[in-house]
Amino acid sequence: MSHKTKSTTQERKAGKSSAPQRQVVSKSSLQKKVSKPTATAKLQKSKALHPRNAHNNGYDFAALVTAFPKLKAFVKPNPYGNLSIDFADPVAVKMLNAALLKFHYGVGHWDIPDGFLCPPIPGRADYIHHVADLLAVKKSSKKRIPKGPKVRVLDIGTGANVIYPLLGIQSYGWDFVGSDVDPLSIANAQQIFAGNSDIANKFSSRLQADSKHVFHGVIEANERFDLTLCNPPFHASLAEASEGTARKLKNLAANRAKSSQVMSPQVQPSGKVKPATDKNHGVLNFGGQKAELWCEGGELQFLRTMIEESHDFASQCLWFTTLVSKKENLNPAKALLAKIKAEEVKEIEMHQGNKITRVLAWTFLKPEQRELWVQYRDAQ
């Protein structure tokens, strides 16, 4: 996986801002004229996952089986004699995820209902590590990633798999709030944390009662988050989602047919659990519920809603972030961020096999306001 980061800073004219006690910034201090952005800064590309990603060396199946014996039945040599699983088998993929969570992150209980998304963990972990870098503060000559419960993160659309809270909690000790429009997803997320008593108090869930909103109805008055995360639904309809699944199945079949090109664990297609009643291997094998796969207007409309609503919570969140699957949606999203006067916008590009995923991050706080935020948080 390679990544590059683009950063745009928009400086506004100085003006008076009045913030109430115990508030780092006020909304009025965020609504000032924006000048032209500075030049784009690029980070050096890397062919690997994030340096802190536990999956940089692929999958150690022998160790995974030892940690999670249920995986053993699905592990077998591939055409080159290396241990692997059939990534077209949704049960095998789910067992692999459970093993990875147990071995690398100490998550003893993890399960999802049939038909819900089963996320590829290495890529999800990369998102967590990259957004952690946004929070890094310089201490002497080194940068420090803040850890522990003082850092609060909001996961929009946490899903039944609740993967981002699990990875963020076990990697950095952060506290999470997970929201979702699906009651079944919320119930399963709660069940997962109930089954992991050592971290059960680090996660709370909130049902989004209105699917037309993202932050409204979730973020409470005077509540503060250091980060928001989101993996938006990227299809505009069920038909479009089905077409996308069909393409994945076709590509997977083509790759399996090429015995001379065995994929490494890091570039395997993302396995997603199919419904248990589906006996036809040609039907949706990558799974996913409606809210996980599509929404009216697709990814772009979801991004627009998220960005517009983020302005209403400008002083309550340090960094807003989201994955962007479709490259063509980046420019419209950035244009909207410029329109609502985001102070700084970053684009982080991540590669996993042939798939390119981008993280879009933005903040309404000026650098000095961010410093005050950190001081206030760490003093609590």
Curated annotation (Swiss-Prot):
<dbReference type="InterPro" id="IPR010286">
    <property type="entry name" value="METTL16/RlmF"/>
</dbReference>
<feature type="compositionally biased region" description="Low complexity">
    <location>
        <begin position="260"/>
        <end position="270"/>
    </location>
</feature>
<keyword id="KW-0698">rRNA processing</keyword>
<feature type="compositionally biased region" description="Low complexity">
    <location>
        <begin position="21"/>
        <end position="32"/>
    </location>
</feature>
<comment type="function">
    <text>Specifically methylates the adenine in position 1618 of 23S rRNA.</text>
</comment>
<dbReference type="InterPro" id="IPR029063">
    <property type="entry name" value="SAM-dependent_MTases_sf"/>
</dbReference>
<protein>
    <recommendedName>
        <fullName>Ribosomal RNA large subunit methyltransferase F</fullName>
        <ecNumber>2.1.1.181</ecNumber>
    </recommendedName>
</protein>
<feature type="region of interest" description="Disordered">
    <location>
        <begin position="1"/>
        <end position="54"/>
    </location>
</feature>
<dbReference type="InterPro" id="IPR016909">
    <property type="entry name" value="rRNA_lsu_MeTfrase_F"/>
</dbReference>
<feature type="compositionally biased region" description="Basic residues">
    <location>
        <begin position="44"/>
        <end position="53"/>
    </location>
</feature>
<feature type="region of interest" description="Disordered">
    <location>
        <begin position="260"/>
        <end position="279"/>
    </location>
</feature>
<keyword id="KW-0963">Cytoplasm</keyword>
<keyword id="KW-0489">Methyltransferase</keyword>
<keyword id="KW-0949">S-adenosyl-L-methionine</keyword>
<dbReference type="GO" id="GO:0070475">
    <property type="term" value="P:rRNA base methylation"/>
</dbReference>
<keyword id="KW-0808">Transferase</keyword>
<dbReference type="Pfam" id="PF05971">
    <property type="entry name" value="Methyltransf_10"/>
</dbReference>
<dbReference type="GO" id="GO:0005737">
    <property type="term" value="C:cytoplasm"/>
</dbReference>
<comment type="similarity">
    <text>Belongs to the methyltransferase superfamily. METTL16/RlmF family.</text>
</comment>
<dbReference type="GO" id="GO:0052907">
    <property type="term" value="F:23S rRNA (adenine(1618)-N(6))-methyltransferase activity"/>
</dbReference>
